[in-house]
Swiss-Prot record:
Mn(2+) 2 binds at D244, D255, E420. Transmembrane segments: none annotated. This is Xaa-Pro dipeptidase. Belongs to the peptidase M24B family. Bacterial-type prolidase subfamily. Gene3D superfamilies: Creatinase/methionine aminopeptidase superfamily, Creatinase/prolidase N-terminal domain. One of its GO terms (molecular function) is proline dipeptidase activity. It catalyses: Xaa-L-Pro dipeptide + H2O = an L-alpha-amino acid + L-proline. HAMAP family: X_Pro_dipeptid. The keyword Protein transport does not apply. Splits dipeptides with a prolyl residue in the C-terminal position.
Amino acid sequence: MIQQDPGALYSDHLAVLCRRAEQALARGGFDHLVVPSGTLHYQVFDDRDYPYAVNPQFKAWLPLTRVPNSWIVFTPGKRPAVIFHQPFDYWHVVPDAPSGWWVEHFDIHIIRKPEEALALLPADPSRCAILGEPQSALGNYVPNNPAPVVNYLEWHRGSKTPYEIALMRQAQVLGVRGHRAAEAAFRNGADEFSIHMAYCQAVGQDANELPYGNIVALNEHAAVLHYTELGRKAPQPLRSFLIDAGASAHGYASDITRTYAAQGHDEFAAMIAAVDAAQQQMCAAVRPGFDYKQLHVDAHLSLMGVLKDFGVIKVSPQTALETGVSAAFFPHGIGHLIGLQVHDVAGFAASDEGGRIERPAGHPYLRLTRVLEPGMVVTIEPGLYFIDMLLNEVKDAGHGDAINWERVDFFRPYGGIRIEDEVLCTDGEADNLTRPAFAAANG
């Protein structure tokens, strides 16, 4: 697996961001783009802060994720500037002095107190598009998040630069390292909490550094789509293991899911293999010009074919889709955009001017409705689950005869299956970012 050096790609990435910012400012009628990194938030009636989360608009420009009270200023025709907050503080570790592949491209101003930024920001706040959260306000510099600017920038974030793709490949490698450690822990009989800790140790990131909370689900827990409880006692017997977990690389996320059967549970292992084969066909369908909504509908038909083959449903895949039976077994979307955010922005945008492309009727949880374009990175994450609440709704709707309930009873103790890769849409064939990382890790 060939890894590109993101440092060598950064200058071109920055040039793209500058062009986008210039166009966005023109759309909104502003002279300056001002992006605060964000501030620490404190728990109510307490002096403890929540884990800091950097403004995604900030980390699009810089590979910095732990620099609160800093700012980026872009003015067309000038070098971008960074106002870098490096306080005098003996209570906490302060950010290291600016270094790395990005520093030569910016005018850098070090400040020791947040209010020192006021003298370095553009003179007239009314001429600034300030992108951030309300808590980032400093004096008269209050985030206004003008829609023409935000819509333009978020739409074009859907197309990743080579620099971004290089970092996303790094995040795949880290995530796969954790997935391998987690599977090994499962095979050794570990509980969910211990599996989670093995994952974090292998990745080298704690829960606050990971892009989202790990889903580590044994047996029936896999039927809870976002199960994050991390049980301290392994169930007996161990039947199945679903893990949905990623990693971060300089602010870019990976989002990977795998499902495993315990030794001796051959029929469930066969169903996992069938879902995996179907998922690979879905990944291959990621092509420019293909409507992601159609990919989602096609996924329903493919997954219902798996259930038909395993005797779980009695009707055709098309009938299962039309009657809502398929939604009981596959109740989420096929995936989403990913990049700086796990659920990256503008998944429903009609254009860089805004607007919204609605989800297809009957599919309320799909997170992406756009037509695929080169440079987009999407997740492909089909799943099959045995969720009593949803299956009871099928009965209540009068479609219980479509399901073989004995087969449901057989598979219910396994919870469910989900397989998830990240796929880059290119000018030609789909580029799966996840599978090569697993292949390299497996030697």
